[in-house]
Amino acid sequence: MTFPRALTVIDDNGMVISIIFWLLLIIILILFSIALLNIIKLCMVCCNLGRTVVVIPVRHAYDAYKNFMRINAYNHNEALLV
C-alpha cells in the first residue's frame, strides 16, 4: 500500500517523523533526569530535617544524661573517715 502522492508534503522517506520522535525521546529523558534530581534533592532535605529535628535533640539529651550520671572516680586523699 502506498501513501497517496497528493497528501505528501515532503518526500523524505520518514526522516522528519524520525527526527520528531528522537527529539521527543530526548525531551522525555531530560524531563526524567530533572525529576530524578528533584527526588534526590527531596531526600537530602528530608535527611537534614530528620537530623535537626530528631538526631541533634536526642544527642543533646543523651549528653545531658551522661553528665548527670557521671560518677567521679574514687580518690583516697579526699575520702572522709568517720
UniProtKB/Swiss-Prot annotation:
Topology in membrane: Single-pass type III membrane protein
Function: Plays a central role in virus morphogenesis and assembly. Acts as a viroporin and self-assembles in host membranes forming pentameric protein-lipid pores that allow ion transport. Also plays a role in the induction of apoptosis.
Virion surface side: 1-19
Membrane spanning stretches: 20-40
GO cellular component, one term: host cell Golgi membrane
Localization (cell): Host Golgi apparatus membrane
Parts of the chain on the Intravirion side: 41-82
One biological process term in Gene Ontology: viral budding from Golgi membrane
Protein name listed in UniProt: Envelope small membrane protein
Subunit composition and interactions: Homopentamer. Interacts with membrane protein M in the budding compartment of the host cell, which is located between endoplasmic reticulum and the Golgi complex. Interacts with Nucleoprotein.
PROSITE patterns according to UniProt: COV_E (PS51926)
Keyword NAD: no
Protein family: Belongs to the alphacoronaviruses E protein family.
Phylogenetic lineage: Viruses, Riboviria, Orthornavirae, Pisuviricota, Pisoniviricetes
Keyword terms: Apoptosis, Host Golgi apparatus, Host membrane, Membrane, Transmembrane, Transmembrane helix
